[in-house]
Design a protein with these regions (language model features):
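N-terminal secretory signal peptides that target proteins for export/translocation
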Residues: 1-7
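Sec-dependent signal peptide recognition
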Residues: 7-18, 137-147
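Bacterial Sec-dependent signal peptides at the C-terminal "C-region" and cleavage site
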Residues: 8-36
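N-terminal processing/targeting junctions
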Residues: 20, 38, 224-226
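Contiguous beta-strand segments within globular domains
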Residues: 34-43, 49-57, 212-216, 235
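Non-catalytic cap/lid and distal C-terminal segments of serine-dependent acyl enzymes
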Residues: 62-102, 107-588
Length: 588
């Protein structure tokens, strides 16, 4: 018997060893490894008496100089964040974050090295919308902050505290949301800057509750002294404007403490910004600057700090609301000419896409766009992803290796984050395109509505696998390069001379790739030739705007001085017979 057992063991031992090794290699790792540590997060009744829906976020940081909620980024200096959805969370009930909860950049609290950390929690509150398309969705309505989860009014958060974290130890770390973000006061009007807001009939009908859009308006010198004047309107598109920034009516603060700009590598860049803001005020009010009205549109919404200024299945008819409700209101209130030949668009990055996108979608309503470093305008180069041909957004196709696609670089090509990093950060901040961040808003604007009422994903947010059926919808509706090529026979005559695009050839987000592709088409056009401009900045990063004479850190502060004189030149060339070219051309 003993001999038989010995023979069996001799035969079975190699097989058992193989099975043992396979079991070990198949054990869950990193984000899936077991840990009994938990974080229990709650809020007291004195802070909020009602049950709340939203996204519960836990931030863990090694840096005690700032609150952890302000330390989450795509770059290598980011701290840790974990998130879960909560529905109907009542006062004193605990939301639990354990090792099964997905995090960024570490995938689980089980991966956190033992040590002392600063911890903070925050509840990003959702509102329930009963939309006109029949869907009921829960989203974070903007509350005047421009979709900033870490400072949105009404959000609950905890006082940061230092705790010892050891995932190998059983226990629960309790966190109380003892504070609430205060309301944001309305901006102050001045002689030159005015703020307007209207309730949009179109958006109110779509969202099933009152929805507003607004504008920060910069009035020309002499506006009150020349009541007979009627002005061209310039729309400076871009991210959410609290007020009309870049315009300073007083000299730079002599007591301003200089700060360092890591983006530009400049000490005292805040002082430079104030100097150029004041310089614009001096130019604007001087005798020779063209007299026009400039607006920055306020169209923050439940998905992002702006809407991309076009109609969308998920966001609603923001394009029509801005073009046919807000702009006529502004033009009437501030004595603008009120015709397409006297309206112009410019902006950078998001504003660059909006400038070109609005010009393409509403070709007769505007007389020219100046699009700097636009977000992807050809989805064959959705940054560096070809959504029509690539299988995965995060990794290059390979049988034997995983090469990640980069997401952010500097002008030397040094990588600070990957596309997977960026998207996983957003996934922690919010599921179903609710992060309020860049990739999610592109998806919200461009995608059809999914069966659950939320944007249908262009790719799996966790794995990067692309859904090519969604990509086809994007192509037909929002790929600006494709739309121009498809419809040039009808669009071409309306857009001749109106398209101007600028981009650095080392744009941090690879936005120049799409510009190369659209340029190939534009330069091939005839009947008519597009007769515009596409230009590149050598070694220029995001967001180069066509200025070859000054560094990017300076030229980005001079959009108005760069483009408004060119707008006036185009008005002089293209205004229809009998157009008013004189009432607004006064000196003082």
């Amino acid at each position: 018997m003993r001999h038989k057992i010995s023979r069996v063991l001799t035969v079975m031992l190699p097989l058992l060893l193989v099975i043992f090794v396979l079991v070990l290699t198949g054990l869950p790792r990193n984000g899936n490894q077991a840990s009994k540590l938990q974080f229990g997060i709650s809020f007291p009744e004195k802070i909020n008496q009602e049950a709340l829906d939203g996204r519960m976020l836990l931030m863990i940081s090694t840096d005690g100089t700032r609150e952890p909620r302000y330390q989450i980024s795509d770059g290598p200096d980011t701290q840790l964040i974990f998130g879960i959805d909560v529905d109907g969370l009542k006062p004193d009930d605990m939301a639990i974050i354990d090792s099964t909860v997905f995090g960024y950049p570490l995938k689980s609290i089980a991966e956190i090295p033992p040590g002392d950390y600063w911890v903070q929690a925050l509840l990003h509150i959702y509102e329930t919308f009963h939309r006109s398309d029949g869907h009921v969705v829960k989203l974070p309505m903007d509350r005047g902050e421009g979709q900033r989860w870490n400072r949105a009014p009404g959000n609950l958060y905890s006082t940061p505290k230092k705790v010892h974290v050891d995932p190998s130890k059983d226990g629960i770390i309790r966190i109380t949301l003892d504070k609430k973000n205060p309301p944001i006061p309305p901006p102050r009007d001045t002689k030159y800057i005015k703020h307007v807001k209207i309730q949009s009939k179109l958006l109110t009908e779509f969202w099933g509750r009152p929805m507003h859009i607004g504008a920060c308006v910069l009035l020309p010198e002499g506006f009150d002294e020349h009541p007979e004047a009627r002005y061209p309107l310039v729309i400076n598109h871009g991210h959410f404007p609290y007020t009309f920034s870049g315009f300073r009516e007083t000299p730079p603060d002599p007591d301003l403490k200089p700060t360092y700009s890591s983006r530009f590598g400049i000490h005292g860049y805040n002082r430079i910004v104030q100097e150029h803001d004041y310089k614009f005020y001096k130019d604007w009010t001087g005798p020779d600057f063209p007299r026009v009205v400039i607006i920055k549109v306020q169209h923050a919404n439940p998905f992002y700090d702006d809407s991309y200024a076009v109609n969308s299945e998920n966001l609603g008819p923001y394009g029509d609301a801005i073009t046919y409700e807000l702009i006529p209101y502004v033009e009437k209130k501030f004595r603008c000419l009120g015709e397409g030949w006297a309206r112009f668009l410019y902006g950078g990055s998001t504003g660059g896409w909006e400038a070109l996108g609005v010009q393409v979608m509403y070709p007769d309503e505007y007389n020219g766009c100046y699009a700097a470093c636009p977000d992807p305008i050809d989805f064959r180069a959705y940054t560096i992803v070809n959504i029509y041909e690539h299988e995965n957004a995060y990794y290059l196709k390979s049988h034997f290796k995983r090469t990640p696609r980069p997401g952010h670089r500097n002008y030397l090509g040094e990588i600070s984050s990957t596309l997977e990093d960026m998207n996983h950060r957003e996934l922690v901040l919010g599921t179903k395109s609710r992060s309020g961040a860049q990739w999610d808003i592109w998806q919200a604007v461009y995608s059809p509505v999914g069966e659950d009422g939320y944007p249908k994903p262009i790719w799996d947010k966790m794995t990067g696998k692309i859904d090519h059926s969604v990509a086809e919808y994007w192509r037909e509706n929002y790929d600006l390069s494709y739309i121009l090529q498809r419809d040039w026979e009808t669009l071409g005559p309306k857009l001749k001379g109106k398209i101007h695009i600028y981009c650095g050839d080392m744009d941090n987000y690879y936005l120049n790739n799409a510009v190369y592709l659209i340029e190939e088409f534009l330069e091939s056009t005839n009947n008519p030739y597009y007769d515009g401009e596409v230009d590149y900045g050598d070694r220029a990063e995001h967001c180069w705007n066509g200025d070859h004479c000054q560094p990017n850190a300076i030229s980005r502060l001079r959009y108005h001085q760069m483009f408004i004189p060119r707008i006036v030149e185009r008005i002089e060339k293209t205004a229809p017979p009998g157009a008013d070219l004189t009432s607004w051309r006064y000196k003082k």
